[in-house]
């Protein structure tokens, strides 16, 4: 990790690692700094000195960190050429009992970090009132692969892909259970559709849509079965087709079909795989292949029940294949 620096106003210092856009920050009380005249951020004053490293917070970059009772006021901070505003509550605690984000806005261009070997997959926030937390994030127009779940005790988790395999950081050191991870996979699948259905998507929504689809697939690969793996590939294919990336759409569609042919999957999956292939070929401009795959999908859909057939036929009807 790269050296970050000191935060004189908070009496802390940090290390940083780039994650390809997001970054991971290791932060601690700076023993060489004067104690601040206020509570330190991230509830560090309440953390025992003997505590093991753990996930303590997350931040969202926004254009304007508007203060609220949950986030606290926005403080102006600076170090060297960098200046930023960040929400910090008077008690130093994070919003929503420690699982909601602080808000940060950089004055000028945000600093960039070299991309490290690890990649952030998703953030999972568990809270007794997920509706309130979800509404808070919606008001911020959240564009990130985040799963909000219900739970008696607030917990924060972050999933990473690393050269040494998957890693899950948590706020309580308990790891992730199968039920939580399956729910995350489903939440991220539905979050992807929310982005797909938006008529006002901008670039940051497109990036979040890709990240959410890939995160859903990543989690399903750990806790799902062949049908979930195939549909995860299918959704990734749809996302890239919508964004005009035919090559990546085709690669995911081919993996979807490969799973359908090699494993036991639900009856609708082969028809969905050929629908995805048809859409990818249409994006690539290969209309002959697109028609062939569309016809294969129609033939397979005939054997499905009415509900599944209607879904497949609706999807096939949205593929832009000219008459001929």
Show where each model-derived region lies.
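Residue signature of alpha-solenoid helical repeat architecture, marking inter-repeat boundaries
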Residues: 179-187, 207, 227, 268
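Residue register of alpha-helical TPR repeats
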Residues: 186-187, 231, 272, 311
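Glyoxalase I/VOC metalloenzyme domain signal
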Residues: 1, 10-12, 18-180
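Amphipathic alpha-helical segments of tetratricopeptide repeats
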Residues: 193, 213-221, 254-262, 295-306
């Amino acid at each position: 990790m790269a050296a970050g620096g000191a935060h004189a106003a908070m009496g802390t210092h940090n290390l940083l690692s780039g994650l390809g856009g997001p970054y991971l920050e290791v932060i601690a009380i700076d023993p060489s700094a004067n104690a601040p005249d206020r509570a330190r951020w991230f509830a560090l004053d309440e953390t025992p000195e003997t505590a093991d490293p753990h996930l303590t917070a997350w931040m969202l970059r926004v254009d304007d960190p508007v203060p609220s009772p949950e986030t606290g006021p926005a403080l102006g901070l600076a170090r060297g050429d960098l200046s930023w505003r960040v929400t910090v509550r008077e008690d130093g605690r994070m919003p929503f009992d420690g699982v909601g984000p602080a808000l940060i806005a950089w004055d000028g261009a945000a600093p960039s970090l070299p991309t490290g070997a690890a990649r952030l997959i998703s953030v999972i926030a568990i809270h007794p009132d997920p509706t309130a937390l979800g509404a808070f994030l919606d008001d911020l127009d959240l564009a990130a692969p985040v799963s909000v779940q219900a739970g008696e005790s607030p917990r924060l988790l972050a999933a990473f892909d690393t050269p040494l395999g998957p890693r899950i950081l948590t706020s309580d050191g308990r790891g992730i259970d199968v039920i939580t991870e399956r729910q995350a996979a489903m939440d991220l699948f539905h979050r992807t559709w929310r982005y797909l259905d938006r008529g006002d998507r901008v670039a940051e929504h497109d990036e979040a849509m890709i990240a959410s689809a890939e995160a859903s697939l990543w989690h399903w690969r750990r806790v799902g079965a062949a049908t979930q793996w195939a549909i995860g590939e299918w959704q990734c294919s749809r996302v890239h087709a919508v964004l005009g990336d035919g090559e990546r759409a085709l690669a995911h569609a081919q993996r979807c079909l490969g799973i359908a042919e090699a494993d036991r999957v639900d009856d609708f999956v082969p028809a969905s795989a050929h629908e995805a292939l048809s859409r990818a070929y249409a994006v690539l401009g290969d209309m002959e292949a697109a028609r062939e795959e569309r016809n294969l999908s129609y033939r397979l859909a005939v054997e499905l029940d009415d509900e599944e057939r209607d879904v497949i036929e609706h999807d096939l009807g949205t593929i832009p294949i000219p008459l001929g």
